[in-house]
UniProtKB/Swiss-Prot annotation:
Residues 480-702 are annotated as: Interaction with LAS1L. Polynucleotide kinase that can phosphorylate the 5'-hydroxyl groups of single-stranded and double-stranded RNA and DNA substrates. Involved in rRNA processing and its kinase activity is required for the processing of the 32S precursor into 5.8S and 28S rRNAs, more specifically for the generation of the major 5.8S(S) form. Required for the efficient pre-rRNA processing of internal transcribed spacer 2 (ITS2). Associates with LAS1L to form an ITS2 pre-rRNA endonuclease-kinase complex and is responsible for the transport of this complex into the nucleolus. The lineage of its organism: Eukaryota, Metazoa, Chordata, Craniata, Vertebrata. Interacts with PELP1, WDR18 and SENP3. Interacts with LAS1L to form an ITS2 pre-rRNA endonuclease-kinase complex. It is found in: Nucleus; Nucleus, Nucleolus. Coiled coil: none annotated. InterPro entries: Clp1/Grc3, CLP1_P, P-loop_NTPase. This is Polynucleotide 5'-hydroxyl-kinase NOL9. Changing residue 312 to A: Abolishes kinase activity and rRNA processing. Keywords: Acetylation, ATP-binding, Isopeptide bond, Kinase, Nucleotide-binding, Nucleus, Phosphoprotein, RNA-binding, rRNA processing, Transferase, Ubl conjugation. The gene is NOL9.
Amino acid sequence: MADSGLLLKRGSCRSTWLRVRKARPQLILSRRPRRRLGSLRWCGRRRLRWRLLQAQASGVDWREGARQVSRAAAARRPNTATPSPIPSPTPASEPESEPELESASSCHRPLLIPPVRPVGPGRALLLLPVEQGFTFSGICRVTCLYGQVQVFGFTISQGQPAQDIFSVYTHSCLSIHALHYSQPEKSKKELKREARNLLKSHLNLDDRRWSMQNFSPQCSIVLLEHLKTATVNFITSYPGSSYIFVQESPTPQIKPEYLALRSVGIRREKKRKGLQLTESTLSALEELVNVSCEEVDGCPVILVCGSQDVGKSTFNRYLINHLLNSLPCVDYLECDLGQTEFTPPGCISLLNITEPVLGPPFTHLRTPQKMVYYGKPSCKNNYENYIDIVKYVFSAYKRESPLIVNTMGWVSDQGLLLLIDLIRLLSPSHVVQFRSDHSKYMPDLTPQYVDDMDGLYTKSKTKMRNRRFRLAAFADALEFADEEKESPVEFTGHKLIGVYTDFAFRITPRNRESHNKILRDLSILSYLSQLQPPMPKPLSPLHSLTPYQVPFNAVALRITHSDVAPTHILYAVNASWVGLCKIQDDVRGYTNGPILLAQTPICDCLGFGICRGIDMEKRLYHILTPVPPEELRTVNCLLVGAIAIPHCVLKCQRGIEGTVPYVTTDYNFKLPGASEKIGAREPEEAHKEKPYRRPKFCRKMK
């Protein structure tokens, strides 16, 4: 009784507003009780206004309109355990509503078809309607079973071999687009029969039935398979590198499609995360492909230039893939030392590309036709040697296929003058110049501008005696051969193609260098992965592999990036990244070693390795390299540059207890070349940011 009296007493003390609010009728807009408009949020007021307008348009009471809206929303909800009521049959007097229901059901019918179907462990089937795309992240092997699709500019048709695609998190996501292909005039039944026969060798009966049920003319059927390579396993074995290929993120709702793609090793991404090409980029690609396929004036030489982070490398890959759709091979001249495409960093190389490039540089390293190890990620303070190496490598170009020239992103001050020298030296037929809103100012490199400007080592056309540009003075400065002086190269002009890109990248001048260093380390790790046994054998630690023993008197040594005292040469070589080169001089006449070179030679580089130890008693170098033994017999020079072994290789050595070899905290940064040796790249020009000043709304008057 005491409790009940206490409750009654508490009830009588309630406020008048609460009793009035509970007594008055509630307007049912939803399952929640009515609230004042003042307490509604912006989205709630907007939803209420939309319901009022909809009810006014339909001519019913707004409360009835709210009920209709709630019923329509309930109809769109997924089925639950409670069965939905069976709709009443449509009266015969209203035949006009039947076509509307039919069209509504037909427009929603494709949404009920799952876009991805699991067809086994690590396999998924993707059915793409014509001109539809599938953007994803991760790595997989793609086989086109029926139709025709395009990935990164490369066309994959039915019957062609599978392609390995690397849509990693260091670059933009890739997409699989279904193309419109030519078909003979056949009925849909005949097309289904043809597709069913093509799928027999890849899919079982149930999967073929699912494909035929969802089949439509001009569609493409793609098989996605799990991909695992020795390169991927080796890179992901180091801490912090696993997220590059597969990045797990929490999913609010796990669907069958997510599970099917997860077994493959990929993840569907939004279209905006994929690669988007501007109209000027597509126009430039179309023009260059047409010129390369016509071959009226010979094979074109295409030089691509522009500032940093504007999409030059992405354009080059897309152009290579486009050209490989029509041509058997494409030549590629790498002149960017810091971000090389097919080789470890610090190289100038010439390659013949016969297979598509469907990923970032560290996923498609190739063996070049000719390569010279410069030894630094930048040509600062040694431009003349850089020009000499470019000319030496370019001399191997046979002009049998189109040539794409990749240049550095340094386009200001001396970098622009160096680019003008490259244009005069290589005589390109087309110059593709990139520009964007966030890039540095760069003048249009028209033929007239190049003729009127002086380079670092070349003079303008107006300063030459002849009206046609000749490289005679340039040859004297670079010590060309006598036969080359007698027949100098003639400059005939080029066609300038401007490309505007809105390439948005989250790189700032502060973190650009760290990002570029990560990409260089990934290229070195990819090269070292060639030491691993083929799949499915397990990985072997680098310190467990047997190195080659090289006598002191068999090879010559040269430190390219800094002057080192002869007594400290072996300290610089030990535990370093070395270039395995071949020079013309014979070094076999020396009995003792080490043999030191006074100047850095311009010679062919056959590969790279790690000097993992030096035996002073037996006078042997211990070199760990994936270069074949038949090529190692011709190596007689070791070049050591500023390119360093990634820190993770030295720090994360499995099976080692105690002190890790070659790892120390006692490092003297004041030694010549010490900052370059640890991988720090000296920028071409110091980036000076202006301090942020707060706006002044008033000033004090004296």
